[in-house]
Amino acid sequence: MKKTTLLNSEISRVTSQMGHTDGLTISDAGPPIPQESERIDLALKEGVPAFMETLETVLSELQVEAVVLTTETREVSPQTYHKIVDLLKQYNPDIQITEIDHESFKKEVSNTKAVVRTGECTPFSNIILKSGVVF
């Protein structure tokens, strides 16, 4: 059995296959997931698993150099936005954070390796993680 925090085999597979700058989306419970994107559905019920819990677990496994958030996250769900930024800075103080509007974000999702759907129901709890290198 794996000793690291992340036990989900699908997420582990995707993160292990990611190269530099490849993207992984973590979303709330209601995202439109493009047909061409791999869907990793973790949602069990409202709030389970939580977005922040899922993000923290993935960050423990994946080297992330940049992220994409929506301006709507900051405007509509500011508490969540600040929790996300604080957590990201714990893992990488130099992380690059880009904000784009939600419609542009949905288009960008189709360029990521997979979409991890959580049970989160806080509006605009979505992020694209861009893989970094460990050297």
Curated annotation (Swiss-Prot):
Pathway: Carbohydrate metabolism; D-ribose degradation; D-ribose 5-phosphate from beta-D-ribopyranose: step 1/2. Its EC number is 5.4.99.62. It catalyses: beta-D-ribopyranose = beta-D-ribofuranose. The keyword Hydrolase does not apply. One of its GO terms (cellular component) is cytosol. One of its GO terms (biological process) is D-ribose catabolic process. Homodecamer. This is D-ribose pyranase. It comes from Natranaerobius thermophilus (strain ATCC BAA-1301 / DSM 18059 / JW/NM-WN-LF).
